Amino acid sequence: MDPWISTQPSLSLDLRVGLPATAAVAMVKPKVLVEEDFFHQQPLKKDPEVAALEAELKRMGAENRQLSEMLAAVAAKYEALQSQFSDMVTASANNGGGGGNNQSSTSEGGSVSPSRKRKSESLDDSPPPPPPPHPHAAPHHMHVMPGAAAAGYADQTECTSGEPCKRIREECKPKISKLYVHADPSDLSLVVKDGYQWRKYGQKVTKDNPCPRAYFRCSFAPACPVKKKVQRSAEDNTILVATYEGEHNHGQPPPPLQSAAQNSDGSGKSAGKPPHAPAAAPPAPVVPHRQHEPVVVNGEQQAAAASEMIRRNLAEQMAMTLTRDPSFKAALVTALSGRILELSPTKD
């Protein structure tokens, strides 16, 4: 081996040309391997509010699922009932009778309960409802419009035996009748004297008529459902149109006694005459006493009937007022229980 080769310090090629030794050492950094356990990390701590919101969200989700299931069940039942109803209507329309309706529905496989059969038969055999009553004690200048009452009665009775549901809907509608009364245009009271007692509970102006409309309710009996609307006609201001809704559940109030009216008329006439008028007045006719007895009896009967009606209505109003009071119920229960304990036999 040549001596110049052995004396050569190194054959490595160093690319760090012109750099100091300290800089070269600084550039070399040790590599550190960090192992992280992603599967066994500790869970993060949740905020109590977030946990409460998550629990509430889960509860609402479960409740929504239950409601969805209930809604689906109700919808299925509704569809089944609707299909049964359509089958019954179709069968009744084809046969045109109550008996045919029941036979066809059972022959097609549908089950009809006996109560439903009895209900349909009673609806088919029931007589038509009576026409709405008209006030009989109205003055001679009142005129009942026959068209409205006849139309309402025709609408209620125009129903075939194969459509019981339509008949039920028609019977549920209140009976409507109209009454036309001539009145003074300057009178703003909107009062129609038809023989009944009314209580006004409202008044307003409608779009189709500049005259106001007054609303009344029958006050003769506490449970009477009849209502009345009074308004002047848009074409003629001298006519009052009274619209009645419903039917009275009581008799007509008795009219005032004729004898009292005659006495008041006689006293008014005698008071309005001049001083020389009594000399020219005709003498009173001589009538046997027996002819006056029926008049007195009729007046007494009317007064007794009126007092009995007023007494009965007052008792009904008092009973309704007492039954609505909870303290009265408690007192009644206490009194009855005490009376029962007093009457019950005591054991020695």
Curated annotation (Swiss-Prot):
Tissue-wise expression: Highly expressed in aleurone cells. In seeds, predominantly present in the plumule, radicle and scutellum of the embryo. Expressed in roots, stems, young leaves and spikelets.
Coiled coil regions, renumbered to chain: 50-84
A UniProt-annotated Pfam family: WRKY
GO molecular function: DNA-binding transcription factor activity; promoter-specific chromatin binding; sequence-specific DNA binding
Any one GO CC term of the record: nucleus
UniProt xrefs under SUPFAM superfamilies: WRKY DNA-binding domain
Keywords on record: Coiled coil, DNA-binding, Gibberellin signaling pathway, Nucleus, Plant defense, Repressor, Transcription, Transcription regulation
Region (Disordered): 91-141, 246-287
Biological process terms in GO annotation: defense response; defense response to fungus; gibberellic acid mediated signaling pathway; gibberellin metabolic process; negative regulation of DNA-templated transcription; negative regulation of gibberellic acid mediated signaling pathway; regulation of defense response; regulation of DNA-templated transcription
Upregulation: Induced by biotic elicitors (e.g. fungal chitin oligosaccharide and fungal cerebroside elicitors) and pathogen infection (e.g. the compatible pathogenic fungus M.grisea race 007, M.grisea crabgrass BR29). Accumulates in response to M.oryzae. Triggered by defense signaling molecules, such as salicylic acid (SA), methyl jasmonate (MeJA), 1-aminocyclo-propane-1-carboxylic acid (ACC), wounding and pathogen infection (e.g. X.oryzae). Repressed by gibberellic acid (GA) (at protein level). Induced by abscisic acid (ABA) in aleurone cells, roots and leaves.
Principal location: nucleus
Low complexity bias locations: 102-114
Gene3D superfamilies noted in UniProt: WRKY domain
Location(s) in or outside the cell: Nucleus
Region feature Transcription repression of gibberellic acid (GA)-induced promoters, mapped onto this chain: 267-348
Family stated for the protein in its record: Belongs to the WRKY group II-a family.
Role this protein plays: Transcription repressor. Interacts specifically with the W box (5'-(T)TGAC[CT]-3'), a frequently occurring elicitor-responsive cis-acting element. Represses specifically gibberellic acid (GA)-induced promoters in aleurone cells, probably by interfering with GAM1. Regulates, probably indirectly, the activation of defense-related genes such as GF14E during defense response. Modulates plant innate immunity against X.oryzae pv. oryzae (Xoo). Confers resistance to the virulent bacterial pathogen X.oryzae pv.
Assembly: Interacts with WRKY51; this interaction promotes W box binding of the complex WRKY51/WRKY71 in a zinc ion-dependent manner.
Name of the protein in question: WRKY transcription factor WRKY71
Organism: Oryza sativa subsp. indica
